[in-house]
Amino acid sequence: VGQGDTVEAQCRSALETIRGAVEQAGSSFEKVVRVNYYLPDGAEFEPCWPILAEAFGANPPAATMVECNLIDPKYRIEIELTALA
């Protein structure tokens, strides 16, 4: 999950945190093969598309969006991904 009051801000923040972790592990977003997105309101996923397209480029990884409650109501999106080494 990321910081911010909107789903867009939290999406950007989460991706920045994840990018740092992926790069520290010796990989990159170009090597991401799978992403899971968890949102309490599936309708909020659409505003994230431009942010995700910018992050993953022309060949995005396989993805699943799950509508579910998150640990705290202030969180609008949680992102989980798998990247190759």
Model-assigned labels for residue ranges:
Residues 1-85:
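Short, polar/acidic, helix-capping and beta-turn segments at strand->helix junctions
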